[in-house]
Structure formats: structure tokens, C-alpha cells
Amino acid sequence: MSSSISAPEGIINPPIDELLEATDSKYSLVIYAAKRARQINAYYSQLGEGLLEYVGPLVDTHVHEKPLSIALREINAGLLTSEAIEGPAQ
């Protein structure tokens, strides 16, 4: 049985090596993906209320796909940009 819709890629695909090219370290990747996943989750939560404060997923999604998997695919596709936050001046 063949289908034109591919299965969700999940957290193991895209590979971590490709994702690390978008950030300085694995720690910044975790923060980057977590923030975007929270935005996606908030977007889905506010849809029922008619508010559009957050931007929805920038890649095609599947019904049961988790926000973190969507965020990682967006980062891998180069659809998001991150900016370094300066620490407090001493």
C-alpha cells in the first residue's frame, strides 16, 4: 500500500549533526528548538479562540506530530534565524 503522504519524521530525523550547523552549540540548539516548540504549541492553543498572536508551523505537518519535531524540521530547513543574546555588561 503506497501513500503520497510521508510518515512524520520524528525526533531522530533530521540528524543532530545537521541541526548543530544552525547553532553554536547543542545547548543553544535545545533552547532554540524549545522556544519555537512553545510558540507552535501556543499557536495551536489560540486557534480556537480566534487569536493570531503567534506564527504557525512553517513546514507541512501531520496530525499527531509533536511541536518539538516540527521546530527541529523548521531549524533544519533553514526557515528560522537565531540571534545571540548578549550577557549583562559588568
Curated annotation (Swiss-Prot):
Among Pfam families, the record links this protein to:
RNA_pol_Rpb6
SUPFAM superfamilies, sorted: RPB6/omega subunit-like
GO terms of biological process kind:
DNA-templated transcription initiation
UniProt name for this protein: DNA-directed RNA polymerase subunit omega
Which reactions is this enzyme annotated as catalysing?
Answer: RNA(n) + a ribonucleoside 5'-triphosphate = RNA(n+1) + diphosphate
- What organism does the UniProt record list as the source? Streptomyces coelicolor (strain ATCC BAA-471 / A3(2) / M145)
Q: How does it assemble?
A: The RNAP catalytic core consists of 2 alpha, 1 beta, 1 beta' and 1 omega subunit. When a sigma factor is associated with the core the holoenzyme is formed, which can initiate transcription.
**A GO molecular function held by the record:** DNA-directed RNA polymerase activity
Query: Per its UniProt record, what Gene3D superfamilies does this chain match?
Result: 3.90.940.10
> Which keywords does UniProt give here?
DNA-directed RNA polymerase, Nucleotidyltransferase, Transcription, Transferase
Protein task: Promotes RNA polymerase assembly. Latches the N- and C-terminal regions of the beta' subunit thereby facilitating its interaction with the beta and alpha subunits.
In short, the EC number is 2.7.7.6
Regarding protein family, the annotation reads:
Belongs to the RNA polymerase subunit omega family.
Q: Which PANTHER family match?
A: DNA-DIRECTED RNA POLYMERASE SUBUNIT OMEGA
Query: One Gene Ontology cellular component annotation?
Result: cytosolic DNA-directed RNA polymerase complex
Q: EC top class, in one word?
A: transferase
